[in-house]
């Protein structure tokens, strides 16, 4: 069942070579990748924090307020499942310039964006209230290193997951899928993942291009199969790495695995929620990273394509809840 979810999330409709990254990533895991990631996230109980890193500045030479629809949408859907299913506290970390649209996605997913103190009150009360916390992050290296340590101490996260988050290369730069340097204005959130690893906090990476945090686990494959791979490959590895056709899809596969493992079909993502989230992302100013247009598409694919992937994942997962004869 989990193998099917992995295959769906890894469909390379965009023909970017990401399907060839799955095998080396899978070789690092004892089970399908969506299940491995879900098990790490399921260690979070009521009131526990999960740090979720996202936000991809796609045209920083124009403005650092222009981010992609891929990433925040998937994180919002997965954060909803962590909140609704486990009463955990998603702590979404992004560029300070993207806090507003990322928060809009979380609200569209049904979560109130609050402070950590307020989130603790919410998760300790018998009356359920779905909440999430958002934080910006420094641009400068030394400040980022200090903030990373402070955040791990403050939140004591059960896991850290980075979704569609461009990762620093060994040269300290960031590059897009064309190999272009787009380091300008980008928060150094890599140090947060690095600090989590040092403190033995479980880490997960989700990406679709080889340049995301986590892809450092399969450097040779990125160099071989991804155009400009030797230029753009991120240096950081994560405990579990999910290459996906679109990073959002990786989140939905993890969400489906969570639903199956927890025995809670109500946690599955839906096409209706997908429409709501992508439209909310565009309305908040996020753009399609491929086209640069502020409209309801992701990675050059229509809303209907993404809704179809969500339906496929749900159909596969639903079989786990049906009695066998």
What spans do the regions from the language model cover?
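Histidine-anchored nucleotide/phosphate-binding helix
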Residues: 65-87
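Positively charged, low-complexity intrinsically disordered leader regions
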Residues: 1-49, 56-58
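A short helix->loop->beta-strand "cap" motif at the edges of active sites that frequently abuts
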Residues: 87-88, 197-203
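Conserved active-site and cofactor/substrate-binding residues in soluble primary-metabolism enzymes
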Residues: 29-32, 36, 70-73, 77, ...
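An acidic, phosphate/nucleotide-engaging active-site surface
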Residues: 104-191
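C-terminal functional extensions of proteins
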Residues: 210-325
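Short glycine-rich anion-binding loops that position phosphate/pyrophosphate groups of nucleotides
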Residues: 55-58, 165-168, 209
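Short internal beta-strands
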Residues: 89-97
């Amino acid at each position: 069942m989990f193998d099917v979810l992995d295959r769906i999330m890894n469909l390379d409709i965009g023909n970017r070579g990401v399907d060839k990254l799955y095998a080396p990533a899978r070789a690092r895991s004892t089970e399908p990748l969506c299940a491995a990631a879900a098990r790490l996230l399921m260690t979070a109980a009521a009131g526990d924090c999960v740090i979720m890193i996202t936000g991809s500045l796609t045209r920083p030479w124009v403005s650092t307020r222009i981010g992609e629809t891929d990433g925040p949408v998937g994180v919002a859907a997965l954060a909803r499942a962590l909140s609704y299913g486990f009463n955990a506290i998603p702590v979404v970390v992004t560029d300070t310039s993207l806090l507003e649209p990322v928060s809009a996605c979380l609200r569209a997913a049904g979560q109130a964006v609050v402070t950590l103190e307020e989130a603790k009150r919410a998760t300790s009360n018998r009356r359920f209230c779905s909440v999430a916390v958002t934080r910006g992050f420094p641009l400068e290296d030394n400040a980022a290193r200090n903030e990373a340590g402070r955040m791990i101490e403050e939140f004591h996260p059960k896991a850290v997951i980075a979704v569609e988050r461009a990762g620093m290369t060994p040269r300290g730069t960031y590059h897009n899928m064309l190999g272009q340097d787009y380091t300008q204005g980008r928060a150094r959130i890599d140090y947060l993942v690095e600090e989590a690893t040092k403190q033995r906090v479980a880490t997960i990476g989700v990406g679709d291009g080889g340049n995301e945090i986590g892809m450092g686990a399969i450097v040779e494959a990125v160099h071989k199969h991804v155009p400009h791979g030797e230029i753009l490959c991120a240096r950081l590895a994560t405990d579990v790495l999910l290459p996906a056709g679109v990073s959002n899809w990786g989140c939905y596969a993890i969400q489906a695995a969570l639903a199956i493992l927890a025995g809670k079909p109500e946690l599955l993502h839906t096409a209706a929620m997908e429409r709501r989230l992508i439209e909310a992302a565009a309305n908040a100013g996020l753009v399609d990273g491929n086209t640069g247009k502020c409209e309801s598409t992701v990675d050059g694919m229509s809303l209907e394509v993404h809704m179809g992937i969500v339906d496929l994942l749900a159909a596969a997962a639903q079989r786990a809840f049906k009695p066998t004869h």
